[in-house]
Swiss-Prot record:
Coiled coil: none
Family, per entry: Belongs to the ClpX chaperone family.
Name of the protein: ATP-dependent Clp protease ATP-binding subunit ClpX
Disulphide bridges, residue numbers: none
General function of this protein: ATP-dependent specificity component of the Clp protease. It directs the protease to specific substrates. Can perform chaperone functions in the absence of ClpP.
Organism the protein comes from: Rickettsia typhi (strain ATCC VR-144 / Wilmington)
Binding positions (ATP): P117, T118, G119, S120, G121, K122, T123, L124
GO MF term set: ATP binding; ATP hydrolysis activity; ATP-dependent protein folding chaperone; protein dimerization activity; unfolded protein binding; zinc ion binding
Taxonomy of the source species: Bacteria, Pseudomonadati, Pseudomonadota, Alphaproteobacteria, Rickettsiales
Gene Ontology terms describing biological process: cell division; proteolysis involved in protein catabolic process
PANTHER family the record matches: ATP-DEPENDENT CLP PROTEASE ATP-BINDING SUBUNIT CLPX-LIKE, MITOCHONDRIAL, ATP-DEPENDENT CLP PROTEASE ATP-BINDING SUBUNIT CLPX-LIKE, MITOCHONDRIAL-RELATED
GO cellular component terms, A-Z: HslUV protease complex
């Protein structure tokens, strides 16, 4: 016990001030601390938190820099890139503002909803953001989620994945980003009330509301269902940014129906509207269309930023095949190079591959499977033969002939012989 030897008066163990010199003196096991030292310690911890947060925000690129990096990997979708870049940047500026203790204006979190057809780049945008940002990031599939108490995955497991991504550093996880894919699959199944619970639709939306808005969630570190006796980790989701994505198949019909019925001259407008492609129709998206699709108003309210991605055309698909840093053609050419072989794809073949993907309506996602199918036999052979050049032509893509394989050595010899023959006698 710390006591002044002269007056037998209690003193602070840290600053040695006497009890009568301070407002409060709090006792611990054989030690005391005064209110002034407590305030000082609190200020020090706040300052350290600010420094840690500034280190995070300082490492976040500006929106223009984020867009520039996204352009290296994602083709097109300029509007979506801009919205994502600004949202991510503002998210971390908001954290810095909240941490500063300045409460004159309350800044709310702005989660994001990405709507676009399959293979338009929703998931790739999120994955690329994960590479750009030095913050914890995780992806989840909404189709595997169910309401608590039913067979399936609880929404708290999404937070567990974020914790794992942050190596169970709670402070880092609370500043992370969560991408929920296929969110359109948890739309309410019907507008009519039913005697059976919609545990994988509206029930999941209800379960996601709290964690998206901001709450202190109890996260089971070993998974929720197999270890019921474990201690839970408390995770504050107030500063976690949620990005949701989905194809929302059929929402274009809902938009067309609304715009037709709200116009004068019904029959004429149907003909005009039919001429619009889905990219143009999605630009007219309203909140009521999402409600009609099956998202509950409370869930939509947690996603204030809504943007649409355009369906990719043939030129965009060809660009995706060849231009980005991680372009699919570049990846396959590198694989052939590792086998001491070459892969040559003619432009007409690239056009045919893009057209196939458009017919299948798989977007960019289907390009790899098409190439994998075309090159399977060639990859099987070149590992043994070596020094081979494999050429893909339009006829190969159309299934008329097999990929053309020639020896690189013989090709070089033929060129050398041709050069000798061309030399004047």
């Amino acid at each position: 016990m710390v006591v002044d030897a002269d007056k037998k008066e209690l003193i602070c163990s840290f600053c040695s001030k006497k009890q009568h010199e301070v407002k409060k003196l709090i006792a611990g096991p054989a030690v005391f601390i005064c209110d002034e030292c407590i305030d000082l310690c609190t200020d020090i911890m706040k300052e350290e938190s600010k420094v840690a947060l500034k280190q995070i925000t300082a490492s976040i690129p500006t929106p223009q820099k984020i867009c520039k990096i996204l352009n290296d990997y994602v083709v097109g979708q300029d509007k979506a890139k801009k919205i994502l870049a600004v949202a991510v940047y503002n998210h971390y500026k908001r954290l810095e503002y909240v941490q500063s203790g300045n409460n004159d204006v309350e800044l709310n979190k702005s989660n994001i909803l990405l709507i676009g057809p399959t293979g338009s780049g929703k998931t790739l945008l999120a994955q690329t953001l994960a590479k750009i940002l030095d913050v914890p990031f995780t992806m989840a599939d909404a189709t595997s989620l169910t309401e608590a108490g039913y067979v399936g995955e609880d929404v708290e497991n999404i937070l567990l994945r974020l914790l794992i991504s942050a190596e169970f550093n709670i402070a880092k996880a609370q500043k992370g980003i969560i991408y929920i894919d296929e969110v359109d699959k948890i739309a309410r199944k019907s507008d009519n009330p039913s005697i059976t619970r919609d545990v994988s639709g509206e029930g999941v939306q209800q379960a996601l509301l709290k964690i998206m808005e901001g709450t202190v969630a109890s996260v089971p570190p070993q998974g929720g269902r197999k270890h019921p006796q474990q201690d839970f980790v408390q995770l504050d989701t107030s500063n976690i940014l949620f990005i949701c994505g989905g194809a929302f198949m059929g929402i274009d019909r809902i938009i067309r129906s609304r715009t037709n019925h709200s116009s004068i001259g019904f029959a004429a407008n149907i003909n005009i509207d039919k001429e619009k492609n889905n990219n143009e129709v999605l630009k007219s998206l309203e909140i009521e269309d999402l409600t009609k699709f099956g998202l509950i108003p409370e869930f939509i309210g947690r996603l204030p930023i809504v943007t649409t991605l355009e369906e990719l055309d043939k030129e965009s698909l060809i660009t995706i095949l060849t231009k980005p840093k991680n372009a699919i053609v570049k990846q396959y050419q590198k694989q052939f190079e590792l086998d001491d072989a070459e892969l040559v794809i003619e432009y007409s073949a690239l056009e045919a591959i893009a057209e196939k993907a458009l017919v299948k309506k798989t977007g960019a996602r289907g390009l790899r499977s098409i190439l994998e199918h075309l090159l399977l036999d060639s990859m099987y052979k070149v590992a043994e033969l070596k020094k081979q050049r494999v050429t893909l032509t339009k006829e190969v893509v159309d299934g008329l002939i097999e990929p053309v394989m020639t020896s690189i050595i013989s090709t070089k010899l033929n060129k050398k012989q041709q050069m000798i023959e061309d030399i004047p006698a």
